[in-house]
């Protein structure tokens, strides 16, 4: 006689065990029709699952985040259904959900083409349009194995043999003649899976191990309705236009090549942006009372063993040997900063010490994960470490938070999401240390009135951390800034200071990064601005061009005036029509184009156009220089004349 408690606190009594869908039907036919699954006592369950005891129940529909994930997971099964009909010999591996969609790894004796993808998608839609029911059948482990043995599915058998207990009751989901195995839940009917798109095929090793067979991974996206799907595909198109790799090539910012995977070759214009970012951060370091240091990029293995990196981070570290000593190229700057702190006696009066570095770091990221500037092996971190007392934690973390928001606002990022990552399973330090560290960060966030999400187990091995994620113009989130509290590393490296009573205490170390990897941040802002960098970041801030050869000397005079004022400017004296020059520099996203004709020479002025095509009219040269300098000084995001 189960009593079902609903989210609003109301209760429904049933004489017999009842399914999730039957509870929904008792509430209303509209809700029953919309039911995808249920959350029983906090656990997601299929709509057909039976509730035998008193329970809480929340109905899951397509409006819920869980409902959308279930739709995507069921679309992966729908993909399996379709590809099995088109390619009966295909072997199915795994088909999980991912952000915004799903994928399925398949083993097929031919390479899938774009035409194949379109055919599979067409068959998926045909099947979904029949609105067939998805039937869940719990079976014994042996029955599941026998089923996949008969169907010739070696990967499903491997999952059963290696990942599922013999005493378990696996669930088989029947999509008409197609059978898949899953924890579920799944949609009860394919009418929920009508809005999807197959996107691409990529290679993927079985179990992610390069020693195993290479499979083909089919990626897709799925949404609750046509509007959501269309909006997502539109965002993808816009993201493709903004791809920093494409823009970086078009604007000649950088390149990468096979001989140095994950390493950036900065060209002049890209390096200009890089140096401007460094200069900007340096002004903030001075404002927030940091000292800037520089540590070695390679240190002996012995030091990395003391820090715990060798035991916890070795897979991501590049190593080398010399004179019978083993060295590691630093993946992060913190151990070097502790060495600098340890030089000379420190008193409590010296604290806090805020130590910053634009540190050149290297991490041996898997080659398959490398992605333009967003995921590299060699990068520069705008890193800092603050050595302080426990009493200073809240005020120092508060100052870090203020600095983060201060810097991000300069780039126009105002949607910032905060996450607190707590202790991972693989960590150093005692639990009481972690208790104090997590409490310290939590207190600082609360004191600053910040809402935050807790990410259990996502902290670094040496301490918990606050993460700051930026939401860009396409709604994507980029995790950049971090503030981490560390009681362990200073102790391991014998850092200490003299207290007021002349005893020795270990300082707390706060790890702080704001841009994170400068390389990655350039990738982010390249996509955010679509290459239309604000004038203070633009590699070339203005181009001065002539109409005929008779204005060449005047152009050079204007260029000199701008250059002497500290602006980045160049002349275009080519024997081309001025319209051609304007179009070319517009494509290069140069903020301002200054045109000099005979009239401008006579009046001692320049005609100014923006890269967005707006004609700003004529300016006295001195007046334009002052306006441009003001834009650079205040780091304006918009050009003159822009709303």
Curated annotation (Swiss-Prot):
Indicate the segments forming the TGS domain, all copies. 1-61
Query: Superkingdom of this entry's organism?
Result: Bacteria
The record's section on InterPro entries has: aa-tRNA-synt_IIb, aa-tRNA-synth_II, aa-tRNA-synth_II/BPL/LPL, Anticodon-bd, Anticodon-bd_dom_sf, Beta-grasp_dom_sf, TGS, TGS-like
Compartment annotation: Cytoplasm
Q: Which Gene3D superfamilies match?
A: 3.10.20.30, 3.30.54.20, Anticodon-binding domain, Bira Bifunctional Protein, Domain 2, Threonyl-trna Synthetase, Chain A, domain 2
Q: What class of enzyme is it?
A: ligase
The cofactor note reads: Binds 1 zinc ion per subunit.
Enzyme Commission no: 6.1.1.3
GO molecular function, a single term: ATP binding
The reactions it catalyses are: tRNA(Thr) + L-threonine + ATP = L-threonyl-tRNA(Thr) + AMP + diphosphate + H(+)
Record has Nucleotide-binding as a keyword: yes
Q: What keywords sit in the KW lines? A: Aminoacyl-tRNA synthetase, ATP-binding, Cytoplasm, Ligase, Metal-binding, Nucleotide-binding, Protein biosynthesis, RNA-binding, tRNA-binding, Zinc
Query: What's the main place this protein lives?
Result: cytoplasm
Q: How does it assemble?
A: Homodimer.
Checking HAMAP family in the record gives: Thr_tRNA_synth
Role summary = Catalyzes the attachment of threonine to tRNA(Thr) in a two-step reaction: L-threonine is first activated by ATP to form Thr-AMP and then transferred to the acceptor end of tRNA(Thr). Also edits incorrectly charged L-seryl-tRNA(Thr).
Protein name, as recorded: Threonine--tRNA ligase
């Amino acid at each position: 006689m189960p009593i079902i408690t609903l989210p609003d606190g109301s209760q429904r009594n049933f004489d017999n065990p009842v399914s999730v869908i039957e509870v929904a039907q008792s509430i209303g036919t509209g809700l029953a029709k919309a039911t995808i699954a249920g959350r029983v006592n906090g656990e997601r369950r299929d709509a057909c699952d039976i509730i035998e005891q008193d329970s809480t129940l929340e109905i899951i529909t397509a409006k819920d985040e869980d409902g959308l994930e279930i739709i995507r997971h069921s679309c992966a099964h729908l993909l399996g259904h379709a590809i099995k009909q088109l390619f009966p010999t295909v072997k199915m591996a795994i088909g999980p959900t991912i952000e915004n969609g799903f994928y399925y790894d398949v083993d097929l004796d031919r390479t899938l083409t774009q035409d194949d993808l379109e055919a599979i998608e067409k068959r998926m839609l045909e099947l979904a349009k029949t609105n067939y029911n998805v039937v869940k059948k719990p079976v014994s482990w042996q029955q599941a194995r026998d089923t996949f043995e008969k169907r010739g599915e070696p990967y499903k058998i491997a999952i059963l043999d290696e990942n599922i207990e013999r005493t378990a009751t696996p669930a088989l989901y029947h999509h008409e003649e197609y059978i898949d195995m899953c924890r579920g839940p799944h949609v009860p009917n394919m009418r929920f899976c009508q809005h999807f798109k197959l996107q691409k095929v990529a290679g993927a090793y079985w179990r992610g191990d390069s020693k195993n067979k290479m499979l083909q991974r089919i990626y897709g996206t799925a949404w609750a309705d046509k509007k959501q799907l269309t909006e997502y595909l539109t965002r993808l198109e816009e993201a493709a236009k903004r791809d920093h790799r494409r823009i970086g090539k078009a604007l000649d910012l950088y390149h990468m090549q096979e001989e140095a995977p994950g390493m950036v070759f900065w060209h002049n214009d890209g390096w200009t942006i890089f140096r401007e970012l460094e200069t900007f951060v340096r002004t903030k370091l001075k404002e927030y009372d940091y000292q800037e240091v520089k540590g070695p990029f390679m240190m002996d293995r012995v030091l990395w063993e003391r820090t715990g990196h060798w035991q916890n981070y070795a897979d991501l570290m590049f190593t080398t040997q010399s004179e019978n000593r083993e060295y590691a190229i630093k993946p992060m700057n913190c151990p070097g900063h502790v060495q600098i702190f340890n030089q000379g006696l420190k008193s409590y009066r010296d604290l806090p010490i805020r130590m910053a570095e634009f540190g050149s770091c290297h991490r041996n990221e898997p080659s398959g994960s490398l992605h333009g500037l967003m995921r590299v092996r060699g990068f520069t971190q705008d890193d800092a470490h603050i050595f302080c007392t426990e009493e200073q934690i809240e005020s120092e973390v508060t100052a870090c938070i203020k600095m983060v928001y201060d810097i991000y606002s300069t780039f126009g990022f105002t949607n910032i999401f905060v996450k607190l990552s707590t202790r991972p399973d693989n960590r150093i330090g005692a639990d009481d240390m972690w208790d104090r560290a997590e409490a310290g960060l939590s207190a600082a966030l609360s004191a600053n009135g910040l809402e935050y999400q807790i990410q259990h187990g996502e902290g670094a091995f040496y301490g918990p951390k606050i993460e700051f994620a930026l939401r860009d113009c396409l709604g994507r989130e980029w995790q950049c800034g971090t503030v981490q509290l560390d009681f362990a590393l200073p102790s391991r490296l014998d850092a200490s200071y003299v207290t007021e009573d002349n005893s020795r205490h270990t300082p707390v170390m706060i790890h702080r990064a704001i841009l994170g990897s400068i390389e990655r941040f350039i990738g982010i802002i390249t996509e955010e601005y679509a290459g239309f960098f604000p004038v203070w970041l633009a590699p070339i801030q203005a181009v001065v061009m002539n109409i005929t050869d008779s204005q060449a000397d005047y152009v050079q005079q204007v260029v000199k005036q701008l250059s002497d004022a500290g602006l980045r400017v160049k002349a275009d004296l080519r024997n081309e029509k001025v319209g051609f020059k304007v179009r070319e520099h517009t494509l290069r996203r140069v903020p301002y184009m200054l045109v000099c004709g005979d009239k401008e020479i006579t009046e001692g002025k320049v005609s100014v156009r923006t890269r967005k095509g707006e004609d700003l009219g004529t300016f006295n040269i001195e007046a334009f220089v002052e306006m441009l300098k003001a834009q650079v000084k205040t780091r304006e995001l918009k050009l003159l004349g822009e709303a």
